[in-house]
């Protein structure tokens, strides 16, 4: 089985930054990977297209995936509001790691973050389910619009997304 690849086309205040491609680790975390894949294609009638990265902290991570409230309090999974932590096999080993944001144990929805550093303190708390395959320079460009409190200086949006 080949792990799926999905893409995000990113804009900053409507100006194209470029494309980020992710490999989703369906071989290790099939349920979590499938959620992100289906939210990227929009095949269930809702998903990431048009949503933004509401929290970007340089040297830490870029967080997005709240397509219902757009502020970090919303989002939902393809399995309903929330789903359980699948496993913690994969670790936050460095830049480019894709992991689920949550509000405590077993509260996965649609919010995720892309690490821009090694974040080992998140191991065992957040489910790692993918990595940046291409376009890490785009993630670094996104990071430049972040701040220490996470507020972005430009609106960083997923203008298009899907499966490759």
UniProtKB/Swiss-Prot annotation:
GO terms in the biological process aspect are: activation of protein kinase B activity; apoptotic process; cell adhesion molecule production; cellular response to oxidative stress; endothelial cell activation; leukocyte chemotaxis; lipid droplet organization; negative regulation of calcineurin-mediated signaling
The record ties this protein, via Pfam families, to: Pro_isomerase
Q: Any idea which residues bear N-acetylmethionine here?
A: 1
Record-listed cross-link Glycyl lysine isopeptide (Lys-Gly) (interchain with G-Cter in ubiquitin), residues? 28
Keywords, A to Z, come to: Acetylation, Apoptosis, Cytoplasm, Glycoprotein, Isomerase, Isopeptide bond, Nucleus, Phosphoprotein, Rotamase, Secreted, Ubl conjugation
Carrying N6-acetyllysine, the residues are 28, 44, 76, 82, 125, 131, 133
Q: Where in the cell is it found?
A: Cytoplasm; Secreted; Nucleus
Q: What residue ranges carry the coiled-coil annotation?
A: none
Q: Which GO terms describe its molecular function?
A: cyclosporin A binding; heparan sulfate binding; integrin binding; peptidyl-prolyl cis-trans isomerase activity
Q: Which residues carry this modification: Phosphothreonine?
A: 93
Q: Which residues carry this modification: N-acetylvaline?
A: 2
| The protein's Enzyme Commission number | 5.2.1.8
Q: What is the superkingdom listed in this entry's lineage?
A: Eukaryota
| Limits of the PPIase cyclophilin-type domain | 7-163
Q: How does it assemble?
A: Interacts with protein phosphatase PPP3CA/calcineurin A. Interacts with isoform 2 of BSG/CD147. Interacts with FOXO1; the interaction promotes FOXO1 dephosphorylation, nuclear accumulation and transcriptional activity. Interacts with integrin ITGA2B:ITGB3; the interaction is ROS and peptidyl-prolyl cis-trans isomerase (PPIase) activity-dependent and is increased in the presence of thrombin. Interacts with MAP3K5.
Known role? Catalyzes the cis-trans isomerization of proline imidic peptide bonds in oligopeptides. Exerts a strong chemotactic effect on leukocytes partly through activation of one of its membrane receptors BSG/CD147, initiating a signaling cascade that culminates in MAPK/ERK activation. Activates endothelial cells (ECs) in a proinflammatory manner by stimulating activation of NF-kappa-B and ERK, JNK and p38 MAP-kinases and by inducing expression of adhesion molecules including SELE and VCAM1.
Protein name per the record: Peptidyl-prolyl cis-trans isomerase A
Q: Which organism is it from?
A: Rattus norvegicus
